Amino acid sequence: MKTLLKITGGILATIILLMIIAFIAINTDYVQNKALHYAIEKLSKRLKTEVKAERISINFLKFTLDLHGISAVLHGKKTDNFLSVKSMRLRGYSVELNELKFVTDNYKPRKNEGRPKRGWFDAGHLDITANLKLHINHWQKDSINASIFEGTAIDTLSGFHINDLHMQVTSDFKNLYVQNAFIRQGNTEIHIPEVEMQLPSKKKGIGLSYHTTKPLTARVILQDISRLFTPALAQFTLPLGLSVNVSGTDNTMVFDDIQIKTEDEKFQLAASGGIEHLKNKYLLNISFHVDKMTAKQGSAAQIIQQFPVKKYMMKQLGNLGNISYKGDFSVLRKREVFSGLIGTVVGDISLQSLIINDSTKYISGKVGTNNLELGKALGMDDIGKIMADATFEFDISKERTAKMRQQLGGKLPMGTLKAKVDEAKYKVLKVKNATLEMSSNGAVAEGLLVISSRILDSKFSCTFTDTNEMHKMKVKPAVKVKLFSKKKKEKD
């Protein structure tokens, strides 16, 4: 028994001695420099670029490895990417990255320079600082499974600020599977149950592709992405619920079964669509088909109030009651195009085309109706139901509008409208085959309604200065008798 105890004690003493020797050796400059050189060599091969690190710390008792001051430069054809990590800790199968910095520089001016309507996001100018904690659940030669259980990333200048990130990732190095992903940007929360991704391979000629196997869901506050993409959303604090299936490649995106709604469900939208030519801003095409959009009384105005734009005809918008829409819209380079059918409690409007031209700063379009109760829409009881087709053009240039307001004042939009009225009713008068022309300089709107018959032409000129007081419109009638004019010509 004594012999056994001596042997056991000798083995333990030897192990402790070896641990002490290993601990002392590992903490010598020679061993640490060797380990640092080995780690840098492996990272350089993996990243295919020169990697630098200031120092390495190995804790033999806690089984931890810390790398400090890691940095690398990835040179691209158009952009240089700078990567650095203040410290990286390996503890068993857990990895902790502190102050991982990713900086890109394409040596060009920022895309929003001189363009205040554009957001600050620019892939050629990023300065992201991230902290990440992950655990490697499984790692073999041909597969890996890891859990990211804590992550943050911020780029103060662009407004990119992910304050919570976690997900589970599995890969066979040909495909990537992401499960139970959660991302929070400000107050916006995105849940991604599952995404399958085919990783690109130049050698095999395989491109990137991906698709969600279950709908992505989110609670979106558009204000959270305003600095990133468009300052116009800076006041949009109305929460929106989103559900969508997403698929695509590195050059396309497809959105199926889109469901968007407000928390009170007074506004709901169902649609599908996609984006083509992501890599070419000149060919970029965003197209959506709206299967159904419903906006209950007041909800359309509530959404419009979220935008910092001049609000015109808001009273008339309220008169429309519940609004529905079914149609299509496309966003092309410097142009947005809409079409479809708008339903209201006072009648339907066929939106044959509506074009917003960002180059000329004009909105133009063509609309028609067979049953619109125009008087109820405008708040003018004397006008009844109307059947008509109309074309219009309005000026949306801030510069031109500001100049006009300085000179004339006024509360009206600037533009023109021309309509062919098949049938309408004004007081007791029933009108057929009439034409209407209206023009507004922003301060005063003038209109002329002409009703032609075989015997006479009836003309009604009108003026108004405020769309909220249409009932105060001044109307001047005039009549031209054709019969006498015709007889006079025959006599001559």
Q: PLM features: what roles do these ranges have?
A:
Residues 12, 68, 117, 147, ...:
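Structural signature for solvent-exposed beta-strand/loop edge elements and short helix-capping sites
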Residues 1-17:
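N-terminal Sec-pathway targeting helices
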Residues 46, 60-63, 95-160, 171-174, ...:
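Membrane-proximal interfacial segments on either side of biological membranes
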Residues 20-105, 118-119, 123-139, 169, ...:
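Terminal hydrophobic membrane-targeting helix
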Residues 1, 5, 85, 487-490:
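Generic cytosolic/nucleocytoplasmic N-terminal low-complexity/intrinsically disordered segments
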